[in-house]
Regions:
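Metallocofactor- and cofactor-centric catalytic cores in central/energy metabolism, strongly enriched
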Residues: 1-174, 178-213
Length: 213
């Protein structure tokens, strides 16, 4: 039975470092992360799409510490999320993000909102785009497949379109894994284009081919 309900885990990120003025300010990153999560949960749920956040899981609701990986991963498993959205509220911690993405083995979407807060002298308070570079490279090192969304505002049409596309792909992956497929007869000899490897389908995707003779 196909299931079209998709739940995405929202994981805002910041850097685990000594706080200091400017781009490594903890409070601004945490405030930004909570605001983005609240906006997504308010404006993007639908009949088939819901979200899970980190409220009550870690104190500041923004993920940064490797020591919290198992706690957050366990929460995502309890919530039965079908995918994870990594949100660079600031420069995220790439090691913690990769370890978390590795745990539930679900589709991952990596995104950084546009940096928008600047002082008159050019001082910026976030460096979200740089975090995407670091995290994407670490995900590659761990051989974790992921999707990237271009930097944009959370209230933009670009974000809405990319989120919907990711949710649709997640739905497909969710229903594809573990599928039982009935094979009625053998392929026609002349159609070499439909040759498949039953063992590889089982190993890679958990698909079961059921011969029906």
């Amino acid at each position: 039975m196909l299931n079209y309900q998709v739940k995405i885990g929202l994981v805002p990120l910041r850097r685990d470092c000594t706080p200091r003025p400017g781009a490594f300010n903890w409070e601004i990153a945490e405030e930004r992360g909570r605001a983005i999560v609240d906006y997504i949960q308010t404006h993007y749920p639908s009949k088939n799409l819901s979200f899970a956040d980190l409220k009550g899981v870690i104190p500041v609701e923004t993920f940064y510490a490797e020591s919290d990986v198992e706690k957050v991963a366990a929460h995502m498993r309890r919530e039965k999320v079908d995918a994870i959205l990594l949100i660079n509220a600031n420069f995220g911690c790439e090691e913690a993000a990769a370890l978390l993405a590795q745990a539930p083995r679900v589709p991952v979407l990596l995104w950084a909102p546009l940096d928008e807060r600047f002082d008159a002298d050019g001082m910026r308070y976030t460096d979200s785009q740089c975090g995407v570079f670091g995290i994407s490279r670490q995900l590659q090192r761990y051989n974790i497949p992921f999707t990237f969304m271009n930097s944009c505002r959370v209230d933009s049409p670009e974000f809405a379109k990319a989120l919907e596309r990711f949710a649709r792909v997640t739905c497909m992956v969710k229903n594809f894994r573990g599928m039982r497929i009935g094979q009625v007869g053998m392929r026609p000899k002349i159609f070499c284009s439909v040759i498949f490897n039953e063992g590889e389908l089982m190993q890679r995707f958990g698909l079961h081919i059921i011969p029906i003779n």
